[in-house]
Structure formats: C-alpha cells, structure tokens
C-alpha cells in the first residue's frame, strides 16, 4: 500500500510538472484576428471618429486662498459636464503639495451640467446644496464653478440648481442671485 501511494504521488507529480513544460518561443507571434476592433485606430463605438484631447482651465483655490486657473485634459470639444467632473476631482498631487485646494465638497454629485448655446447661460444641477458650507468656502466654491463654466462657454453666467430647483446663491458683495456671472467673482481671483 505504501508503494502504491508513493508511485501514485510520483505519477501525479510528473503529470502536473508536464503542464509547465511549454516550449518557449523567442519571437512574438502575430495575432491574426482581434475581436471587436480593439486594434483599430479609433475607439470602439465612436463611428470611426477620432477623439482629440485639449487642455482646459479649471479654477482651484491657491495657497493664498484666491482662485487660480489650472489646466486639465478633456476631450474636444469640451463639454461643461466633463470639465466640471475634472474640477470636482480636486487639485492634482503636485498642486496639493504646492498648497492648492478645492472649496467644493468631495461628496458633491453632478446630476447634469449644460450650456445653452443660444443664451450663453450654463446650468449645473447638483444632488445636494452648497448652502451648508461656511460662507467663505461657499463663495470660493461658487467662484470655482462660475469661472470654470465661463471658459467652457457659459459667458452670460451660471445657474446653480439642486435637484432641479434653482438656488439663490451668495455673491462676494453679500447679496444673493439666481444667475451668477464671472464678473461677480473677479475679486476672488489671484493677482
């Protein structure tokens, strides 16, 4: 019985060791067919259109507590929703090490963000309000949004909504407005 166990163990080990004995090939082999067009020069599902990327400014809070532009890479043409998503990611590691921050809460959820081409007014709809933020942080957060939206095409201003309801937001002057413009927040820019 002992010899059988040893013999079966040796046969099993030999059988398993042969699984790893693959003849190495010194040259890579060419794959003839790749499914789903994964090697094509365009992104699958884009109707053979090439996606181009550009740098787009977003506004973050510098070490002095002022708003400053910083570049992000986004698909061209830049859509407000895409640029706001980049803004919500906050400063990069390099920017953080230089003292840059964001006044926007990390938990902020964008429901929609669009610019009406005819009017030049941007609308961002959030899942929660910015009113819970301290006043200084709220001003910086709104400034980040309106200045970033301006460079994407919201030249006439920005309307901030929460679950579809237009918000009356705080301005640096202490007043409130439903449509905020970049001019309202010029005093928060660095320099």
Residue ranges and their predicted role:
Residues 1-191:
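Bimodal "functional hotspot" detector
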């Amino acid at each position: 019985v002992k010899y059988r166990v040893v013999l079966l163990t040796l046969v099993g080990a030999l059988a398993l060791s042969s699984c790893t004995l693959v003849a190495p090939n010194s040259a890579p082999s060419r794959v003839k067919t790749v499914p789903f067009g994964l090697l094509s020069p365009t992104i699958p599902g884009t109707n053979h259109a090439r996606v181009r990327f550009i740098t787009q400014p977003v506004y973050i809070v510098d070490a002095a507590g002022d708003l400053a532009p910083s570049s992000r890479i986004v698909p061209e043409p830049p859509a407000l929703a895409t640029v706001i998503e980049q803004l919500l990611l906050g400063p990069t590691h390099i920017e953080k090490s230089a003292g840059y921050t964001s006044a926007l809460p990390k938990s902020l959820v964008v429901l929609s963000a669009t610019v009406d081409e005819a009017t030049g007014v941007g609308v961002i709809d959030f899942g929660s309000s910015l009113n819970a933020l301290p006043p200084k942080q709220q001003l910086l957060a709104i400034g980040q949004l309106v200045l970033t939206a301006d460079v994407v095409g919201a030249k006439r201003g920005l309307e901030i909504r929460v679950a579809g309801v237009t918000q009356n937001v705080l301005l640096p002057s202490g007043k409130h407005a439903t449509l905020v413009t970049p001019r309202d927040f010029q005093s928060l820019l660095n320099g």
